[in-house]
């Protein structure tokens, strides 16, 4: 049977047994902060086992996409070196939620294996938990397995637990004996590749309490899992998972790309490399298709490590170009029918992987050079361990994950000091913490809060009111500051990227200007910057304001215009986010935002610079939506799961409460958001992007303005265009572009002529200087400062100067933009007969100006930071020449 037939046969079998066939959950868990990746079929049903959720069915079956490349379940470093480990795999499984139990699970498993798939009964073994007599009897009495093939094991092998506490229970596994003579009984559960587990049937019947005792569950569940790649290899009679038709299309494509054929050898370097590349391409393609992005933290860094590990192995095949992105289409073709997201996201995933590959290849070569130097030094000193500090340098400077360095070291017969590496990592973290603590010390003025109420929390009423009567519950003064907490306030405190409101607080005596509003736990803190004493009719310092208990009542008024401008920008951010996901792809996820009354800034995951056409498309999409003037619907106090089910965007790594606020623009955008927004998107008026740039690898940033700020920007640009048109005496926009292009061409030509003229004049000056220069051992030595010249002119002049004397060596020096520029030359005869080296000589000169450089024997350049020592550099050059010539 082909692999796709085996998969479908499994699903059809359980569909006939009354199971609902459910789609695989994404490999990126949507609502489980304990997981980086989906690593088992049961992950999407975890809430059912924990009695926190339910399904509209009691029987289910699926094929689940899984990744095991981090944490407890981490197969990364074994991939390629054996025949059965994978970072990505499929898990076939069937489940019962309080419905059938051990009898059906065991007998159906046996039926599928021996009746439908016709696996040899004499080669199958069933293991049960040592105390699970019920399962033992079912195997013995309800199946025709050889009773001698029913084996009992203890907690380690046959008792499944979700964690230290929670649902758990005994399990029964089916193993197959692949030894030549069928003598593998003693190899069951010892980790021998000749007798392997095929299917694990877990019977969830207990709840492990914190004190360790087992409490029976009111409902018993069944959770089974079978590795798809493993069962395919067995049914196709292959000795390795990698020899089946699951991997053959990938190996064929790798051969097409590299010219290297897969030989199915366990130890051959080429075959190890091909297994790694094929496996890692699957992991990356599926993860990115489900919305993950490579990055420097969390799940993204695991994916980046996987990609870089595969690229390193591609060098073993003699291939030095991006390779993984070329396998995405092969996977989409082979598996897209079962997993349509591979086809839907193929183009974007390929582009993301290619961009990552190109980025790492630039540093890979430099890192390999450094690694080679380290290895050579160790060999010369008979060392065996690469220092942790060197491994950290490879990580910090060249992006080499530690396990990649360890892999390369093992290939060369060396080890890496892991403890030393971790020490360097910890030092870096400590420095970052120290910086943060220092900032906290600067921000903390040491003043104490005075509270007038036992209730410290503030109620926010600003969604519905911009003016509100409130009572002061807390006050803090000192160092020029006045901070106030109210029992209820219309002021929005900075959070979720939106800046805090400003406005006024007023009581019977004072009018206080609130410059900012921030959160401090559950309290909303109003930062007062200016105060006016109405009794004294004069301004007072905020720290001198005297508020007594009789004057705690205040009228709180938010600056209406500023709030409305911030709301325009915030709602526009939601529209832009949705437009980016439509235009660029669903891999776009918010990575950060800043929303103020003046502008908006949005950071998002994307792998390349946006083209002018893409930026224009985003602007057009947002402004088109604004003109639709749709209402903005705010849903308060929504269950998180209900919000996500209705399409609200929620991303792994973000923290959400059980109940959330949802901001919906019908048909356009649905997001979890606690910020303030316009009531109708038409009130945004106009949206204009002002910049797009990179802020980190795989993260782009867009800045934009809306409403009056956008109008102001457009009028400013229009006025500037009109001024340019008048200066150029141009008619129409095209004429302006043509005239400016013509001016630029003329400028370039004039600059070229000027440079040639200056170079010619400099050559003439230097030729005379060279003829007058002193000779040392028959070689003329020129060391001269050339004022009011740039480095490029000096380089051109130097090349011409080499023909002006048979044996000569020289150093030209100047100061350009406050930096020293040095250019050195040596004629062919000076190099050949006098063994002079311009590169070595210029390095001696550069030391005097705290600089460095180098080049070839005939020509070299250098720079420096100390113009005041220019004469010392010239003297050092001359001295070095004299020392060389004796």
UniProtKB/Swiss-Prot annotation:
InterPro entries xrefs: aa-tRNA-synth_II/BPL/LPL, Ala-tRNA-lgiase_IIc, Ala-tRNA-ligase_IIc_anticod-bd, Ala-tRNA-synth_IIc_core, Ala-tRNA-synth_IIc_N, Ala-tRNA_ligase, Ala_tRNA_ligase_euk/bac, DHHA1_dom
Pfam family, one: DHHA1
Molecular functions per Gene Ontology: alanine-tRNA ligase activity; aminoacyl-tRNA deacylase activity; ATP binding; tRNA binding; zinc ion binding
UniProt KW keywords: Aminoacyl-tRNA synthetase, ATP-binding, Cytoplasm, Ligase, Metal-binding, Nucleotide-binding, Protein biosynthesis, RNA-binding, tRNA-binding, Zinc
Residues that bind Zn(2+): 570, 574, 673, 677
Position of the signal peptide: none
Catalysis: reaction(s): tRNA(Ala) + L-alanine + ATP = L-alanyl-tRNA(Ala) + AMP + diphosphate
Gene Ontology terms describing biological process: alanyl-tRNA aminoacylation
EC number per UniProt: 6.1.1.7
Any single GO CC term annotated in Swiss-Prot or TrEMBL for this entry: cytoplasm
SUPFAM superfamilies: Class II aaRS and biotin synthetases (SSF55681), Putative anticodon-binding domain of alanyl-tRNA synthetase (AlaRS) (SSF101353), ThrRS/AlaRS common domain (SSF55186), Translation proteins (SSF50447)
Main localization of the protein described in the UniProt heading: cytoplasm
NCBIfam families from the UniProt entry: alaS
Domain observations: Consists of three domains; the N-terminal catalytic domain, the editing domain and the C-terminal C-Ala domain. The editing domain removes incorrectly charged amino acids, while the C-Ala domain, along with tRNA(Ala), serves as a bridge to cooperatively bring together the editing and aminoacylation centers thus stimulating deacylation of misacylated tRNAs.
Entry function: Catalyzes the attachment of alanine to tRNA(Ala) in a two-step reaction: alanine is first activated by ATP to form Ala-AMP and then transferred to the acceptor end of tRNA(Ala). Also edits incorrectly charged Ser-tRNA(Ala) and Gly-tRNA(Ala) via its editing domain.
UniProt similarity note: Belongs to the class-II aminoacyl-tRNA synthetase family.
Protein name in UniProt: Alanine--tRNA ligase
Gene: alaS
